[in-house]
């Protein structure tokens, strides 16, 4: 078992667990904690090789990242939790809900996919090659530029600088490992197995990570699932429009089955 950095906030009885994406760490969810801490116990953690979590060499898989989450929940004796994940974190959350339905109270995959496709894979193969040849610093700026809308980038340079620092906390092993997992993503045919109450959330201006039309299609494969789009937000919707995202988040999580 790897050493995993995690943080618990809040004083409520029900758990909600946030799952990060590629080159993110648990600080990406800082803007969501105040909206939930009165009513929920909030668990955030770093994927292996990201932030403060231990890295291992070699390719990772989505199944391995699901096992990491299961091990953490077991260690903390969290029997059931709602899951919120963004990007690769959304894929991990979907996979966890498929493999461990008894542990998931509600599911909110954000700005994500359930299957890798050739054109998207080509972009990630190019990013991996750049990192291998030039190091992680070479993809920091292209990543920041891809994650947010032009309007947001112009108005919030201080947020972009925080994001750059977050990306730089990712290890080379962690980046290569989780991108390999992402390239192997193939969950779409199993989405009908999801039993948890599910809300798919996209950023209205997300063109690549989890475009609204793609996420609407995913929601149609899960019994009873819905899709909503956060206005004025691109890929990292929870940071670009925290008010809009948090309204959807709190409305969804506070409803019980």
Where are these regions (language model features)?
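Acidic catalytic loop of the alpha/beta-hydrolase fold
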Residues: 205-209
């Amino acid at each position: 078992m790897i050493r995993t950095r995690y943080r618990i906030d809040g004083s409520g009885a029900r758990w909600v667990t946030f799952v990060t994406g590629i080159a993110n760490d648990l600080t990406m969810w800082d803007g969501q904690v105040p909206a939930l801490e009165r009513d929920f116990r909030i668990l955030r953690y770093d994927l292996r090789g990201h932030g403060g979590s231990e890295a291992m060499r070699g390719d990772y898989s989505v199944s391995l990242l699901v096992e990491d989450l299961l091990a953490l929940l077991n260690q903390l004796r969290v029997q059931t939790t709602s899951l919120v994940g963004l990007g690769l974190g959304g894929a991990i959350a979907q996979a966890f809900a498929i493999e461990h339905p008894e542990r998931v109270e509600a599911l909110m995959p954000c700005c994500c996919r359930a299957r890798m496709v050739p054109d998207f894979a080509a972009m990630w193969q190019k990013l991996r090659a750049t990192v291998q040849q030039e190091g992680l610093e070479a993809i920091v700026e292209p990543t920041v530029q891809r994650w947010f809308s032009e309007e947001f980038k112009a108005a919030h340079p201080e947020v972009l600088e925080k994001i750059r620092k977050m990306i730089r906390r990712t290890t080379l092993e962690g980046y290569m490992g989780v991108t390999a997992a992402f390239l192997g993503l193939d969950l779409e045919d199993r989405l009908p197995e999801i039993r948890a109450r599910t809300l798919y959330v996209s950023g209205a201006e997300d063109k690549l990570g989890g475009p609204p039309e793609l996420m609407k299609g995913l929601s149609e494969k899960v019994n009873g699932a819905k899709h909503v789009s956060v206005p004025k937000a691109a890929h990292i919707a929870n940071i670009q429009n925290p008010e809009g995202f948090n309204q959807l988040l709190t409305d969804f999580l506070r409803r019980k089955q």
